[in-house]
Amino acid sequence: LAAALHECGHLLALRAFHVPIEGLRLSAFGAVLHARGVQRLSYGRELVVTLAGCGMNLVCGVLTAWFSLHYVWVEGFVFAGAHILLCAFNLLPIPPLDGSHALNLAVSALFGPLVGDAVAALAGVLCSLALLGGAVYLYVQTRGGALVIFAALALLLSALKELRLARRAIKV
């Protein structure tokens, strides 16, 4: 439910900017919306669309937590936590997560797309290495969380691919 509402946040922002939606693709890391005119959005508007999913999760998480507190709905805290965790995870600057795209857009708006690509790719590698280190530490300490190691490795591979593409673009 949290992932579906996250994508609804992106969808609502795209609709607000009158961008037609072509489709929705499910992947191992969640869902990806395909929109026809998103390339024509300004950096600022694309940043709004990128952060709208996390914004939706944050609003839903806070509202669910408030509702759970005031109406003694203990299970609601699980839903609130899922929204907040999904929001925080998606804000990590690791491709293909929203945080990486947001960082790329912000830096690109200031310094151009080549610098934006390079900064986002480097941040992605560094953050995914930190995530992998934390996952390995967790596994060594608790003998649990092996799936987190695999997820961190997948994110590291994605970040390394982006770094390779950014380096190639700078050389051209």
Residue spans for each PLM region:
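Hydrophobic transmembrane alpha-helices and their immediate loop junctions
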Residues: 1-172
